[in-house]
A protein has these predicted regions:
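Polytopic transmembrane helical bundles with strong interfacial aromatic enrichment
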Residues: 1-299
Length: 299
């Protein structure tokens, strides 16, 4: 297969994946709408209502799986077209990041039954891919000299996986805060009838961050080792390095507050979102508009 054919195939697969993520988004939206229309505690709720809502939810999950199964080879063939790993510019970071976020959700869907997160996850993946193919797209090209290193695979893969799980934990923390706002008034929103308790949401967000924080730590260390090999110094307070460290400190503070101080609930959720915002700032602003040796966006 020629490089051009691989590039075309990659583009087609990514567009096809977007179709299924769009279908998943609308199916999840219908599932939520039907749940709101007939609350779980309603005496008028029938077995047919439960069955109908469950079927559309299962269909939405199937669309999410199909989207992932198309996006995965789309990312792979992008690398084939460039004869390298597909992590050389913001377009490639974005499609791979969407893949990692989707994979983290599907893993959590299987292990923790998180179908209720499908709506925001599908929307986030769609927005990321839509931005990638419309604003960030660049033809396949060789890597910059500084990126030609085995550390690219080690460092970037760890960062992408960490980011996908961090963002999933942030979605759960945001859901916690939305429900908590209602429950402070003695209410529980209709759309949250089937969701886990606040305590379960709080614990799940914490478990995801605790699970992936060591990998993020490894990513930061691997980046420093790579910097020494490429530029002759381990740390130079480049904007990208600085914000990666800030993200590490923020999530470390979150874990410390949970384990040592005993923070739970609202305060922990806000701290989790704050940590996630530092990651997104680094990923979006620093990559696109930042200056320094880590400016690889290709824009």
């Amino acid at each position: 297969m020629s490089d051009n054919s691989a590039a075309v195939l990659s583009n087609n697969l990514i567009y096809s994946a977007m179709i299924f993520y769009t279908l998943a988004f609308f199916a999840h939206a219908v599932e939520v709408a039907w749940s709101v229309k007939t609350p779980a505690n309603s005496v008028k709720k029938t077995k047919l209502d439960f069955s109908r809502t469950d079927r559309i939810g299962r269909l939405a999950s199937a669309f999410m799986v199909l989207g992932f199964l198309l996006l995965l080879p789309g990312v792979i063939f992008r690398g084939v077209s460039a004869n390298r790993v597909p992590w050389g510019n913001m377009y490639e970071f974005s499609i791979t990041g969407a893949l990692a976020f989707s994979a983290a959700y599907l893993f959590a869907l299987k292990k923790y039954k998180l179908r209720w997160l499908g709506l925001p996850v599908a929307l986030s993946v769609l927005l990321t891919l839509g931005t990638a193919v419309t604003l960030l797209y660049r033809p396949s090209a060789p890597l910059m000299p500084a990126l030609k290193s085995p550390w690219l695979v080690i460092h970037v893969s760890a960062a992408i996986i960490s980011g996908g799980v961090f963002l999933l934990a942030n979605c759960i923390a945001a859901t916690y805060l939305m429900i908590d706002r209602y429950e402070q008034k003695g209410l529980r929103p209709v759309w949250a009838e089937k969701l886990p308790s606040l305590e379960a949401l709080d614990n799940l967000s914490y478990r995801l961050v605790a699970l992936v924080f060591p990998l993020w730590t490894f990513s930061v260390i691997a980046g420093a080792i790579w910097a020494e090999a490429a530029w002759g110094r381990y740390w130079g307070w480049d904007p990208k390095e600085t914000w990666a460290f800030i993200t590490w400190v923020a999530y470390a503070a979150y874990l410390h507050a949970r384990v040592t101080i005993g923070w739970r609930g609202r305060k922990a959720a806000w701290l989790c979102l704050l940590a996630g915002s530092t990651f997104l700032f680094n990923y979006i602003y620093v990559n696109v508009w930042g200056t320094g040796r880590h400016t690889y966006s290709g824009l």
